[in-house]
Amino acid sequence: MARTKQTARKSTGGKAPRKQLATKAARKSAPSAGGVKKPHRYRPGTVALREIRRYQKSTELLIRKLPFQRLVREIAQDFKTDLRFQSSAVMALQESAEAYLVSLFEDTNLAAIHAKRVTIQPKDIALARRLRGERT
């Protein structure tokens, strides 16, 4: 007879657990009676990777136009009241703001990867800004 390789098996030891007949029967009958199907869920990270690919392909602006315009007007009001903006000026500001944020998040992600992490943290943003020579 040929030798077979032995594999380690987990043994619980001690007494065998007592069977609970009432709860098992209730569990088996519940799904068939209700017929409620669990909603489909993707594994963690799948949707995130899909969104990354989607937004890297696209060129449209990601910040909504009106909230950004309100923010620009609110900030400008601190410097001078009754300022008017051409729509093209607000669009140029939004383009440059989004380009800056994308670039900052790229550098932040590199800082997180350098620290052997996949999750970005505020200290990564601080490091990226410091390396760029920006004020903190």
From Swiss-Prot:
Q: Which residues carry this modification: N6-methyllysine?
A: K5, K10, K19, K24, K28, K37, K80
What is its subcellular localisation? Nucleus; Chromosome
Instruction: Report the residues modified as N6-acetyllysine.
Output: K10, K15, K19, K24, K28, K37, K57, K65
List the keywords (alphabetical).
Acetylation, Chromosome, DNA-binding, Methylation, Nucleosome core, Nucleus, Phosphoprotein
Query: What SUPFAM superfamilies does the annotation carry?
Result: Histone-fold (SSF47113)
Q: How is it modified after translation?
A: Phosphorylated to form H3S10ph. H3S10ph promotes subsequent H3K14ac formation and is required for transcriptional activation through TBP recruitment to the promoters.
Q: Which InterPro entries match?
A: Histone-fold (IPR009072), Histone_H2A/H2B/H3 (IPR007125), Histone_H3/CENP-A (IPR000164)
- Family from the record: Belongs to the histone H3 family.
The record describes its quaternary structure and partners as: The nucleosome is a histone octamer containing two molecules each of H2A, H2B, H3 and H4 assembled in one H3-H4 heterotetramer and two H2A-H2B heterodimers. The octamer wraps approximately 147 bp of DNA.
Q: What is this protein called?
A: Histone H3.2
Which species is the source of this protein? Mycosarcoma maydis (Corn smut fungus)
Please state the gene responsible for encoding this protein.
HHT2
